[in-house]
Amino acid sequence: MDQTYMKEKPVVPLLLSMGIPVIISMIAGALYNIVDSIFVAMISEDAMTAGSLVYPIQNLAHAAGVGFGVGINAMVAGRLGEGKTRMANQTASQGVFLSALHGMILTILGMAVIPYFLRMFTSDEVTISYGLTYFCNVFLFSTIDTMGMAYEKVYQSVGKMKISMAAVLIGCGVNIVLDPIFIFGLGPMPELGIRGAAWATGIGQTASLLFYLILNHVKPLNVEISLREMRPSKEICGGMYSVGIAATLNMALTSLLLTALNAILAPFSQVYILVLGVYYKLQALLYQGASGVVQGMRPLIGYNYGAGEQERVKKIFRAAFMIVGIIMTAGTLLGELVPDFLMGLFTQTPSTVEIGRTALRLISPGFVMSTVSVIASGAFEGLGMGLKSLKISLMRYAVIIIPIAFVLSRIIGPTGVWHAFWLAELITAVYAGASWKRTITVSL
């Protein structure tokens, strides 16, 4: 199929056609996480706390899969823009192979690390038991998950956003249906508790990958994924890793941040860890929507930059900025206006809801501020400038927020951690805006 529509179709309709399917799929994934957490919370608050403690390691593994997928996406889209179809085929094939290898490595490392990781934050044996049970079961599916992410990014790189949306919806649908059946033992299924939540997740991931494999067999992509092209090439792998490692670190920084914040909050009470975990489930709904726009934007920027359409790259950036700004404004309003309702989805304990209300109202203004950073970071990835994207994420998730959270928590208590979010977003937005302005002046 001819990909020239990426540089010929009007920018806003094109971005929406690329972005909306991904937004739907990303929001569906975030909603699944929320629904899954609600079911887990029905087991007990200990189970919910265990999920919050496990989340950083789970997110780290997810970051490795998605981050490398971003490298695949950027390189395939760029080679297609340059008219190098054979190299695009090699990139896609080698990307799928390496993603499977990454999944195997993640399974081994995750199983080895998780017992020690959990004991860093709690000595409660019930919470530790819940965490180990969930983690060890869900990580059995890591290879399937990383391969599914690789196929998703290949399909997105050629503009097949509706296909990737369908795959995510299938996986989430299977997951949500199986969650109550496996967790609570409906019908002939025995009650599996938190183990059931893990197996529902893994089976959903398997369903998504099977959808891609069957579809690609029945109706092959114009980018060919084949065994004969899977032998790693230094040039191709280097290109994928140069973007993929930076993108992985971008997303893995969330795990670093959560681990650090859990350590800061743990001396006050485990309730604060639970609230932080709930916040991250809720904010995922917002940022996954924004990520959908970025994923629609990224191949468009990569293709048009490769095709020498610099002015069109700038137009795509502006359109994406406008859309994400609307999403983030909506998120800020929800956090300010209905925090009790949002917290009440996960717990009915009055003291926990009160702490969550304070957290959401203090953190929410940072959503609007983060628009600049989110779009600039994604645009840099699309241009193959992974290091610039990484610098922005380092500021958002480590260099600024962690020291501020630590210092403020010592001065005003755990509330200081919530203030650190919006302060970090404000400072990073100024830097990201200036960095993008310099880039378009020099490179575009």
Segment roles from a protein language model:
Residues S17-D36, N137, G171, G204-S208, ...:
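Transmembrane helical elements of multi-pass membrane transporters/channels
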Residues M1-G19, V76-T143, M189-I245, I301-G366, ...:
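Short alpha-helical transmembrane segments in multi-pass integral membrane proteins
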Residues G69, N73, V138-Q156, S164-C172, ...:
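Short runs within selected transmembrane alpha-helices of multi-pass transporters and secretion channels
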Residues E8, V12-L31, V35, I57-A64, ...:
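Residue-level signal for short hydrophobic patches within transmembrane helices
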Residues A28, Y32, A61-G65, I105, ...:
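Residue-level hotspots within pore-lining transmembrane alpha-helices
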Residues M48-I108, D145-G159, I163-S164, N262, ...:
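Small-residue-rich hydrophobic transmembrane alpha-helices
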Residues I27, L31-T49, L118-E125, I181-L192, ...:
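Helix-terminus/linker motif at the lipid-water interface of multi-pass membrane proteins
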Residues L60-A63, T107, N175-P180, L209-L213, ...:
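Hydrophobic transmembrane alpha-helices of multi-pass small-molecule transporters
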